[in-house]
Curated annotation (Swiss-Prot):
Gene expressing this chain: mex-5
MF term (GO), any: protein domain specific binding
InterPro entries listed in its UniProt record: ZFP36-like, Znf_CCCH, Znf_CCCH_sf
The protein's name in its UniProt record: Zinc finger protein mex-5
PTM remark: Phosphorylation on Ser-458 by par-1 promotes localization of the protein to the anterior cytoplasm of the zygote. Phosphorylation by mbk-1 appears to be required for subsequent phosphorylation by plk-1.
Chain positions with Phosphoserine modification: S458
């Protein structure tokens, strides 16, 4: 305690020479106190049993004050002033945050000490107290600077107190040394305790998530027995396909700017908007029957609800190649064909040289065209030798959307050296303009065209040296 008094005197200023210094408190030579500059935390020894007089320096003047009223320590560890009449006054907490108090034991002599300005206040207690261990406070995460006189002081040994058995969580261990700030009663966990608690929390969360996943994955046996193949028959699959079709149809109409039709009706928008060709022909009944999406008569024919198509500027402006020269006279598209057919009123605007000849029409009327039928052609070229060769049109298996790709072949052609061909008599009006002019008997063949044209009546593609 002597070292602490000297340090206080040196820090606060010089003491008046006329004033007698108080002697050392009893029983404190073996229990030193360590004082830091911030005056926030301190070490204290056991309190004595004898009454202690209280001396306090309230200001920095050199005047001497009389002993103050005694104090006592309540259950919370706070020191409360005891009034003179002995009655219990309202509790007055002497420990105030921000004020430098240093609690010391009672001196042996009753001399008073006058403190200079800037010195810490020394408070002595007169209330008799039972010997008890004072709390030990440490500066958290910061070591207090020690004075030179304190370097060789031995630490104080606190009396052993049996710890109370308290229920704690599994895996959490409490250290014997509790570190806490002065204004807090809850000890801070050490690094070992913190790591133990974090590890237990992680293990608990992993097990909780695992059990939740298992609960969702497990299905009762009763629900599994209800899942059979009967729930997914053809009717349900077809209904799912129809719903999928209506959803995509509504999305397409919405992207194109048209109003989305109602999805109440399960039929497509063009249902029964055209006549069934099989039923209208009257040859045989329609194989589809009631499932046919085309109208079987005018009673079933209804107006279309589908939005109108954008107009085609080239609609019905060119002759269909199936009805041109060398055509089969049959169009697989029928009424859906966008080219001119002989039954259309636009057929009058087609030049005669582009139309099918009358001989082709008369001959092809008796021929029922099929997908793989070889369409016969009228013999155009006659040999002077007497035997006629018949160029035939061979339809390929791979057809395009415009019609069958056909090539000409001269089957059984037996040409002799020096033979010539004679063209049958024909009207010049039926010829195209580039063939109406007078041509030489033997035109040069050095500039023969070898393009893959679809004009099946072109003599240049045949490789013949004749002319019309």
């Amino acid at each position: 305690m002597k070292a602490a008094s000297n340090s206080v005197s040196s820090a606060g200023g010089s003491v008046s020479p006329t004033t007698t210094q108080p002697p050392l408190p009893p029983g404190q030579s073996s229990h030193p106190q360590i004082y830091d500059q911030q005056m926030q935390y301190y070490f204290a020894a056991a309190m004595p049993n004898q009454p202690m007089a209280t001396y306090a320096a309230q200001n920095g003047s050199s005047q001497q004050y009389a002993p103050a009223a005694p104090y006592y320590q309540d259950a919370n560890g706070q020191y409360v002033q005891v009034p003179a009449n002995g009655s219990m006054a309202p509790q007055q907490h002497m420990m105030v945050s921000g004020q430098p108090y240093l609690y010391m034991a009672q001196p042996q002599q009753g001399a008073q000490q006058v403190m200079q300005s800037g010195q810490p206040q020394l408070i002595y207690y007169q209330q008799s107290m039972a010997p008890q261990a004072a709390p030990m406070y440490f500066h958290p995460m910061q070591a207090a600077p020690m004075l030179p006189e304190q370097m060789g002081v031995m630490p104080h040994t606190q009396p052993a107190i049996p710890p109370q058995q308290q229920p704690r969580q599994v895996g959490v261990e409490i250290s014997s040394t509790r570190t806490a700030p002065l204004t807090s009663s809850t000890p801070l966990p050490t690094s070992l305790e913190y790591e133990t608690v974090q590890r237990d929390n992680r293990n608990r969360n992993i097990q909780f998530r695992y059990h939740r996943v298992m609960e969702h994955d497990e299905l009762p046996i009763d629900e599994i027995s209800k899942i059979t193949l009967d729930n997914h028959n053809d009717d349900t699959m077809s209904a799912e396909k129809e719903n999928h079709f209506h959803e995509h149809r509504g999305e397409k109409f919405g992207r194109r700017g048209f109003p989305i039709p109602e999805t109440d009706s399960q039929q497509p928008p063009n249902y029964k908007t055209r006549l069934c060709m099989m039923h209208a022909s009257g040859i045989k009944p329609c194989d589809m029957g009631a499932r046919c999406k085309f109208a079987h008569g005018l009673k079933e024919l209804r107006a279309t609800d589908a939005p109108a198509r954008y107009p085609n500027n080239k609609y019905k402006t060119k002759l269909c190649k199936n009805f041109a020269r060398g055509g089969t006279g049959f169009c697989p598209y029928g009424l859906r064909c966008e080219f001119v057919h002989p039954t259309d009123k636009e057929f009058q605007n087609i030049p005669p040289y582009q139309r099918m000849s009358h001989d082709d029409q008369d001959y092809d009327q008796d021929v029922i065209p099929e997908d793989y039928v070889v369409a016969r052609h009228q013999p155009r070229f006659m040999r002077t030798g007497g035997r006629a060769t018949t160029p035939t049109k061979v339809m390929l298996k791979h057809r395009n959307v415009a019609g069958s790709m056909m090539c000409l072949s001269n089957a059984g052609r037996d040409l002799q050296a020096g033979g010539d061909y004679n063209q049958p008599e024909s009207n010049e009006d039926d010829l195209p303009p580039h063939l109406r002019r007078n041509r030489r008997e033997n035109p040069p063949m050095n500039k023969r065209r070898t393009s893959l044209s679809t004009k099946w009546t072109s003599e240049e593609n045949l490789g013949l040296r004749g002319h019309y």
